[in-house]
A protein has these predicted regions:
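Nucleotide-activated chemistry modules centered on ATP-dependent adenylation/adenylyltransferase
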Residues: 59-325
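Intrinsically disordered, low-complexity, charge-rich segments with an acidic bias
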Residues: 10-41, 52-59
Length: 325
């Protein structure tokens, strides 16, 4: 039986192909090990309700894509985070029959289990519609290694750590001044892959930023802005096509990493309520950070709040209040 996933794991030196995505929270023995025939066991698309393409139609579409690709002077690349905006971008580009050569996703290792399941469904949808799979980039060591174990190499950084009296290893909690998580786990990997692609062809890099987030736009392609698709519209497009993100957007403002220090207090309250195991893991990470980096910025999860402090606050909120007559 042929593996129906093939992803690219990239570090700074080489590109390594893997036949399975290393998702701890997803059953690898189900959707990842499917045959070509399993994509066409129904006569319709269960996500859109539309009639499915036959094997012959998919083969013909692939051949046409190859022909179109060879005739075009650029690669059409979609940056898929998996959130509502980038998912809506992918859906609309498919529906508008715009060229899509490569869809890349940078996995920060700390997504919600529901997000990994969502990406599985999006990958199946992409394969059915365009005959390609998501290409996933991963840092070879991951978030926790970067947070606690990455050795400091620059003499200035080492000297500063010595003066602070903290560990010479790890970056601590990400902060507004040093948001190393996004840089190391997403931007750096994606930029390196885009630069590699540019050695072959010109690249049109499409990013899913909504029309009401126009301040984030710089020099790349932002179709949602051009089409006037707001965040609310993007989410509705996803819902209309059967992508509900496992209910994440009903509990959280953004479906970002579950350990993100930039979450709202209300989101952290919901993390404790709806994902108690992740909350427990976050408490352990925060305790380790305090022991390794102290009470300074590196060891502080959120300004004015530690996870232990939030645990006490949330527990206090749950206690029944005495109502006086």
């Amino acid at each position: 039986m042929e593996k129906c996933r093939e992803y690219v794991c990239k570090d700074n030196k080489n590109v390594q192909k893997k036949s399975n995505y290393e998702w701890d929270k997803v059953d690898k023995n189900t959707t990842n090990n499917c045959s070509k025939e399993s994509h066409n066991q129904w006569g319709y698309n269960p996500i859109t309700g539309e009639e499915k393409k036959s094997d012959e139609e998919i083969k013909s579409a692939k051949q046409q894509d190859k022909k179109d690709f060879s005739e075009r002077d650029s690669l059409s690349v979609i940056n898929l985070s998996g959130g509502k905006d980038s998912t809506a971008l992918l859906i609309l580009m498919i529906e508008k029959e715009l060229p899509i050569d490569i869809v890349i996703n940078a996995d920060p290792w700390m997504e919600f289990p529901e997000m990994y399941e969502h990406l599985e469904r999006v990958d199946e949808y992409l394969y059915r519609e365009r005959g390609i799979h998501i290409t996933t980039l991963r840092h070879p060591k991951g978030f926790e290694w970067l947070m606690f174990e990455e050795p400091k190499k620059r003499s200035s950084a080492i000297q500063k750590r010595i003066e602070m009296g903290v560990s010479l290893y790890g970056n601590g909690w990400p902060g507004f001044k040093v948001r190393w998580c996004t840089g190391q786990l997403k931007i750096k990997l994606i930029d390196a892959e885009i630069q590699r692609m540019k050695t072959e062809k010109r690249v049109l890099h499409h990013i899913g930023i909504a029309a009401d987030e126009v301040q984030r736009c710089k020099e790349k392609q932002y179709p949602l802005v051009e089409w006037g698709i707001t965040e609310a519209k993007a989410l509705q497009i996803c819902y209309d096509h059967g992508f509900d993100f496992g209910g994440l957007y009903k509990k959280y403002h953004r479906a970002s990493c579950w350990c993100c220090p930039f979450q709202r207090i209300s989101e952290l309250r919901n993390l404790r309520k709806y994902h108690p195991q992740l909350w427990k893991q976050l408490m352990e990470m925060d305790q380790r950070a305090k022991e390794q980096f102290g009470s300074g910025a590196l060891g502080q999860f959120k300004q004015r709040w530690s996870i232990e402090g939030l645990e006490n606050r949330f527990a206090q909120e749950e206690k029944p209040r005495l109502i006086l007559p």
